[in-house]
Swiss-Prot record:
Gene source species: Arabidopsis thaliana (Mouse-ear cress)
GO cellular component, one term: plasmodesma
Name of the featured protein: UDP-arabinopyranose mutase 3
Function as written in the Swiss-Prot or TrEMBL entry: UDP-L-arabinose mutase involved in the biosynthesis of cell wall non-cellulosic polysaccharides. Catalyzes the interconvertion of UDP-L-arabinopyranose (UDP-Arap) and UDP-L-arabinofuranose (UDP-Araf). Preferentially catalyzes the formation of UDP-Arap from UDP-Araf. At thermodynamic equilibrium in vitro the ratio of the pyranose form over the furanose form is 95:5. Is not active on other UDP-sugars (UDP-Gal, UDP-Xyl, UDP-Glc, GDP-Man and GDP-Fuc). Is probably active as heteromer in vivo.
Quaternary structure and interacting proteins, as annotated: Heterodimer with RGP1.
Lipoprotein recorded as keyword: no
Subcellular location: Cytoplasm, Cytosol; Golgi apparatus
Documented EC number(s): 5.4.99.30
Catalytic activity: UDP-beta-L-arabinofuranose = UDP-beta-L-arabinopyranose
Cofactor: Mn(2+); Mg(2+)
EC class (word): isomerase
Summary of the tissues where the protein is detected: Specifically expressed in developing seeds.
Motif (DXD motif): 106-108
Domain observations: The conserved DXD motif is involved in enzyme activity.
């Protein structure tokens, strides 16, 4: 595992244009090992669970801390779209941010090391991924052609070499892999030690299981679609929040002509969650995903949808019409999707209400 404190302080990229969003139910001691990489950035911490519990944050970080009472105060009746007792609550941080970019990480994710033993600056790599183009329309067999030491291979169309705007950078994990509960149960001791030094664009028309524990995106571009759904307390499903967002985001990025990257950077995922608890959360989703994925694979958004908000509302309508037949939960989820967009517009319009930082600065 990585040492507790890195000795190297890098020059921060985009420090005034990026927020780090962290959902948590516990003290954030893990930030100490990220201090050299995160200290000069602004943090948005979304406290899940009991709002009366005091969350301790190491001294020296610039942050806002929101709990459920703050979410209810800021959103009023629209707070119903934000999940409770589930890490899906992190998307509230996306909504109240005023920055162009978001990086979100879980509180059990530590600094990883590459095969040479060098600590990985995950945030820096995500930023590089977002600032360079993607290649969603034609696959380059050398993966990222914009990376140092790589280029487009023979046969790659010259007309496509400018690439597409990158909307999402999806990072990976060493140590504990992001498995579903059935896989956890049959492979309880499995660890991921395989470091693949590659970044690739997920091709247009291909879905992927997005994981929210090491994820960056262009908030101004795709933020309104980064809704992590209704999960956790009072809902018949959990642990599908990030994947639901990923399916929606990928369909919209394909429609808008934007790219989604996956691969580097790696973080060290420190602990496995309980597979029996996970199975209870995932049980319905294991069956529902067999209906949901074909739905997203077949969705075609009308050309009249020219903004992310329009695309997302169209998706919400289709979710209600098509997936509502699978289970009434999807009708509730579609309502949440619409409420999310209404709340996003309310907080992010030119005349929108400012979400006051409830705990000030540290």
């Amino acid at each position: 595992m990585a040492q507790l404190y890195s000795s190297v302080k890098p020059t921060p990229m985009l420090k005034d244009e990026l927020d780090i969003v962290i959902p948590t139910i516990r003290n954030l001691d893990f930030l100490e090992m990220w201090r050299p990489f995160f200290e000069q950035y602004h943090l948005i911490i979304v406290q899940d669970g009991d709002p009366s519990k005091v969350i301790n944050i190491p001294v020296g970080f610039d942050y806002e801390l929101y709990n459920r009472n703050d979410i209810n105060r800021i959103l009023g009746p629209k707070a119903s779209c934000i999940s409770f007792k589930d890490s899906a609550c992190r998307c509230f941080g996306y909504m109240v941010s005023k920055k162009k970019y978001i990086y979100t990480i879980d509180d059990d994710c530590f600094v990883a090391k590459d095969p040479t033993g060098k600590e990985i600056n995950a945030l820096e790599q995500h930023i590089k991924n977002l600032l360079s183009p993607s290649t969603p329309h034609f696959f380059n067999t050398l993966y990222d052609p914009y990376r140092d030491g790589a280029d487009f291979v023979r046969g790659y169309p010259f007309s496509m070499r400018e690439g597409a705007i990158t909307a999402v950078s999806h990072g990976l994990w060493l140590n504990i892999p992001d498995y579903d509960a059935p896989t956890q149960l049959v492979k309880p001791l499995e660890k991921n030690s395989r470091y693949v030094d590659a970044v690739m664009t997920i091709p247009k028309g291909t879905l992927f299981p997005m994981c929210g524990m090491n994820l960056a995106f262009d908030r101004e571009l795709i933020g309104p679609a980064m809704y992590f759904g209704l999960m956790g307390d009072g809902q018949p499903i959990g642990r599908y929040d990030d994947m639901w967002a990923g399916w929606c985001v990928k369909v919209i990025c394909d429609h808008m002509g934007w790219g989604v990257k996956t691969g580097l950077p790696y973080i060290w995922h420190s602990k496995a969650s309980n597979p029996f608890v996970n199975l209870k959360k995932e049980y319905n989703g294991i069956f529902w995903q067999e209906e949901a994925i074909p739905f997203f694979q077949s969705v075609t958004l009308p050309k009249e949808c020219t903004s992310v908000q329009q695309c997302y509302l169209e998706l919400a309508k289709l979710v209600r019409e098509k997936l509502g037949k699978v289970d009434p939960y999807f009708i509730t989820l579609a309502t949440g999707m619409v409420t999310w967009i209404e709340a996003w517009e309310e907080l992010n319009s030119a005349e929108g209400t400012e979400a006051e930082a409830p705990k000030g600065k540290n």
